[in-house]
Regions:
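Aromatic/basic-lined ligand-recognition segments
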Residues: 136-143, 147-157
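A glycine-rich, hydrophobic loop/mini-helix early in the fold
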Residues: 49-91
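Short, conserved charged micro-motifs
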Residues: 54, 89-93, 178-181, 197
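Long, positively charged amphipathic alpha-helical accessory segments at protein N-termini or as interdomain linkers
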Residues: 105-126, 153-244
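Short, solvent-exposed loop/turn segments at the edges of secondary structure
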Residues: 75-77, 137, 165
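Active-site loop/lid in soluble adenylation, ligation, and acyl-transfer enzymes
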Residues: 1-57, 64-65, 133, 194-244
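Contiguous, small/hydrophobic- and glycine-enriched helical/loop subdomains that border
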Residues: 79-129
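Charged, often glycine-rich, active-site loop that binds/positions anionic groups
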Residues: 126-139
Length: 244
């Protein structure tokens, strides 16, 4: 079995979320997508209230994620989305976080980023107490001495089959709205060569952790069609963003 690898150019918020949902719904093989955000945007966790972010600067692009957790200001970062059948991950949610976060720690370590998976603290929750994801390091998060470096969240569905979408964001440069977060640039680099090397290492380490063979690919025609539909009918719609 292969892990299909999609490495995309930075995209708009609605498009990014639409593609990830299309992969969760239609992907016939495990798929890892690596991408960025242009323009920079704020994503809200599935359970968050949009009204809690009324103080964002005018013109800030906001989108709702399919996954839970706190809001993220997506700036200069590497975002990954893993769409995979549930039986290819540990049944326990926390164990699946550990598997994937350990792979991320190994990837970052090869680039000289001093980080670790937090073994203490509160367990992961889809409904965080702080509105910002990176303000609240919890058990199994990837952290540096300066704070949380990797924010993750999941969505698990049972129909048409048991599937998981795992989102992760690794901060390269501190974003404007959340300048207190940790970033790879704090200790090493956050430039384009670093980004490319990190993407390569993440893909290699995730494939090894999942015991899959890495295979570059692209969106299928049905996935692309569904993503375009979801972008227009869901993720670009203000009512969907504000539905909580």
């Amino acid at each position: 079995m292969h892990l299909r690898l999609l490495v995309d150019e930075p995209g708009a918020a609605a498009w990014n979320m639409a593609v990830d949902e299309a992969l969760l719904t239609l992907a016939l093989q495990p798929t890892l997508r690596l991408y960025g955000w242009q323009p920079h945007a704020v994503s809200l966790g599935w359970f968050q209230r949009a009204s809690d972010f009324a103080d964002l600067p005018p013109g800030t692009e906001v989108v709702r994620r399919l996954t839970g957790g706190g809001a993220i200001h997506h700036g200069d970062e590497v975002t990954f989305a893993l769409a995979i059948d549930a039986d290819r991950l540990p049944r326990e949610v926390s164990a699946s976080y550990r598997l994937l976060h350990d792979a991320a720690v190994r990837s970052l370590g090869e680039l000289g980023v001093l980080c670790e998976r937090l073994v203490a603290g509160a367990a992961q929750s889809p409904r965080p107490t702080d509105r910002w994801c990176f303000a609240q390091p919890g058990r199994d998060d990837v952290v540096t001495a300066l704070g949380k470096l990797l924010g993750s969240a999941q969505r698990r569905v049972q129909q048409p089959r048991a599937r998981v979408l795992h989102h992760g964001s690794i901060v390269l440069q501190r974003p404007a709205l959340t300048p207190w977060v940790a970033a790879t640039a704090d200790t090493t680099a956050g430039d384009e060569p670093f980004r490319r090397r990190l993407c390569t290492l993440l893909a290699t380490q995730f494939a090894a952790a999942l015991d899959l063979e890495l295979a570059p690919g692209q969106l299928t025609a049905p996935e692309l069609a569904l993503a375009e539909q979801l972008q227009e009918q869901r993720y670009r719609q203000p009512d969907f963003t504000r539905h909580r």
